[in-house]
Amino acid sequence: MLMPKRTKFRKQMKGRNRGYATRGASLSTGEFALKAVEAGRVNSRQIEAARQALTRHVKRQAKIWIRVFPDKPLTKKPLQTRMGKGKAGVEEWVMNIKPGRILFEMAGVSEELAREALTLAMHKLPFKSKFVTRESENEIY
């Protein structure tokens, strides 16, 4: 499970996920990438499921970079609990994803194999995303 080693505060406010990604919106090291088209939240289980789908499909031939990390605690009250009595405990760790954010990068394989693998990973995520290459990364969403 991906989560921070330590944080300054145990709990955070929910916040709002608006606008487009400015940071993490361009390829840094890989040739091919998975780019978010919609806004959403991704948790550590979804990141791990997508990573496993990628590595199993390319049979460890490619170099894969994970460009997202869940650093926001999400709290949830137990079932059948009355309102009040303070904020609940941390249930899971998530990351807010804005449109345009690069999620995974890949290098060292052909474009067809990378497209197949990143499409498998795409289906593990709770929002729409698309396959991009170095040439096509600056296209409008």
From Swiss-Prot:
Record's protein name: Large ribosomal subunit protein uL16
Similarity annotation: Belongs to the universal ribosomal protein uL16 family.
Compositionally skewed regions (Basic residues) per UniProt: 1-17
Start and end residues of each stretch annotated as Disordered: 1-22
GO cellular component terms listed in the entry, alphabetical order: cytosolic large ribosomal subunit
Subunit structure, as described in the record: Part of the 50S ribosomal subunit.
Pfam families reported for this sequence: Ribosomal_L16
Alphabetical keyword list: Ribonucleoprotein, Ribosomal protein, RNA-binding, rRNA-binding, tRNA-binding
Protein's GO biological process: translation
InterPro entries referenced in this protein's UniProt entry, alphabetically: Ribosomal_uL16, Ribosomal_uL16_bact-type, Ribosomal_uL16_CS, Ribosomal_uL16_dom, Ribosomal_uL16_sf
Ribosomal protein keyword on record: yes
Organism of derivation: Campylobacter curvus (strain 525.92)
Task performed by this protein: Binds 23S rRNA and is also seen to make contacts with the A and possibly P site tRNAs.
GO molecular function: rRNA binding; structural constituent of ribosome; tRNA binding
